[in-house]
Regions:
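Short, structured segments at the rim of ligand-binding sites
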Residues: 1-215
Length: 215
């Protein structure tokens, strides 16, 4: 856009005021943190394709692809889309230190895996919309899934049968989306209190789930 930016080792940035902007064509990338729950839906419940997603993106949350592959899901990508297909899922290890917004989606993935998955980086979750590590453990327990956060900076999720229940989103959009994806394979409906909080980052989340014929 014609604006000059100075920096110190890309840690500090300095932008002089009163610069003149110039028009240009710019393509805005899809949001990988928003796409993550839908990609997990494909891994646990059927085939899902998300458009306008580039594997060459610099967004840290592209790491969801690595987690899906490690768990055994089939992943196919093009220059503009990612498709995930359900396969038999196995426990996985993953370091989410640099992509903490993936924790809720990873929880719904791990809940559907055979064995105990280990995810590192829980210290990054203390000051999110809720204390996400504690909230995930509390709400998934209601669905019969054990999440152990006793070890510093580590979350262990024992996959198993997901039961219908009523959960509280705690006003956290990613918790609501995580439990909605978990509900896809539950043995009875999961009721999510405060589900409207998804509007913070993904207002059409439930509409998009309905397009996948989810009820």
């Amino acid at each position: 856009f014609g604006v000059e930016i100075a920096h110190k080792d890309y840690q500090e940035f300095f932008i002089e005021g009163n610069q003149r902007y110039t028009s240009t064509n710019y393509q805005i990338e899809g949001d990988w943190s928003g796409a993550a729950p839908m990609l997990v839906a494909g891994a646990v419940a059927g085939e899902v394709t998300v458009e306008n997603m580039s594997r060459l993106s610099l967004q840290a949350d592209t790491a969801i692809i690595k987690a899906l592959i490690n768990a055994g899901a089939e992943v196919e990508s093009t220059d503009t889309s990612v498709t995930v297909r359900r396969r038999k899922l196995k426990a996985f290890e993953f370091d989410a230190t640099h992509c903490p917004d993936l924790f809720p989606a990873l929880a719904s993935l791990a809940a559907n895996c055979e064995g105990t998955s280990i995810i590192y980086g829980t210290e990054r979750l203390l000051h999110k919309e809720s204390n996400r590590a504690a909230t995930l453990a509390e709400e998934y327990a209601k669905a019969g899934i054990e999440i152990d956060i006793d070890e510093p900076n580590v979350m262990r999720i024992r996959g198993g049968k997901i039961h219908g229940c009523t959960i509280d989103s705690h006003g956290d959009h990613r918790i609501a989306m995580s439990m909605a994806i978990a509900a896809l394979t539950a043995d009875a409906p999961i009721v999510i209190k405060g589900a409207e909080c998804v509007a913070k980052s993904y207002p059409s989340f439930f509409d998009d789930l309905e397009q996948l014929l989810v009820k």
